[in-house]
Amino acid sequence: MDSIVSAASVIAAGLAVGLAAIGPGIGQGSAAANAVEGIARQPEVEGKIRGTLLLSLAFMESLTIYGLVVALSLLFANPYVG
């Protein structure tokens, strides 16, 4: 039973990191593309767009970090493994 729980924890940790990276990765690419497009249209507001982009990228990246925290807790602080 213990080996099944350990194997499931490793698989779940891999899925947590993988799935947590897909959404923010797509969102970051879309946000960067739209920011570059906005800067190309209105170069005079480049500083404001860049600041907003960096803030939104930080928020998106935090979702990936949460997935990493879940994966690490499954691997190293799993209460189901004896």
From Swiss-Prot:
Its membrane topology: Multi-pass membrane protein
InterPro entries (UniProt xref): ATP_synth_csu_bac/chlpt, ATP_synth_F0_csu, ATP_synth_F0_csu_DDCD_BS, ATP_synth_F0_csu_sf, ATPase_proteolipid_c-like_dom, F/V-ATP_Csub_sf
Gene Ontology molecular functions: lipid binding; proton-transporting ATP synthase activity, rotational mechanism
Localization (cell): Plastid, Chloroplast thylakoid membrane
Sites marked Reversibly protonated during proton transport: E61
Taxonomy, superkingdom: Eukaryota
A Pfam family recorded for this sequence: ATP-synt_C
Transmembrane segments: 7-27, 57-77
Primary localization: plastid
Gene Ontology CC entries for this record: chloroplast thylakoid membrane; proton-transporting ATP synthase complex; proton-transporting two-sector ATPase complex, proton-transporting domain
Record key words, sorted: ATP synthesis, CF(0), Chloroplast, Hydrogen ion transport, Ion transport, Lipid-binding, Membrane, Plastid, Thylakoid, Transmembrane, Transmembrane helix, Transport
Role: F(1)F(0) ATP synthase produces ATP from ADP in the presence of a proton or sodium gradient. F-type ATPases consist of two structural domains, F(1) containing the extramembraneous catalytic core and F(0) containing the membrane proton channel, linked together by a central stalk and a peripheral stalk. During catalysis, ATP synthesis in the catalytic domain of F(1) is coupled via a rotary mechanism of the central stalk subunits to proton translocation.
Miscellaneous information on this protein: In plastids the F-type ATPase is also known as CF(1)CF(0).
Assembly description: F-type ATPases have 2 components, F(1) - the catalytic core - and F(0) - the membrane proton channel. F(1) has five subunits: alpha(3), beta(3), gamma(1), delta(1), epsilon(1). F(0) has four main subunits: a(1), b(1), b'(1) and c(10-14). The alpha and beta chains form an alternating ring which encloses part of the gamma chain. F(1) is attached to F(0) by a central stalk formed by the gamma and epsilon chains, while a peripheral stalk is formed by the delta, b and b' chains.
Protein family according to the UniProt entry: Belongs to the ATPase C chain family.
Protein name: ATP synthase subunit c, chloroplastic
Gene symbol of the encoding locus: atpH
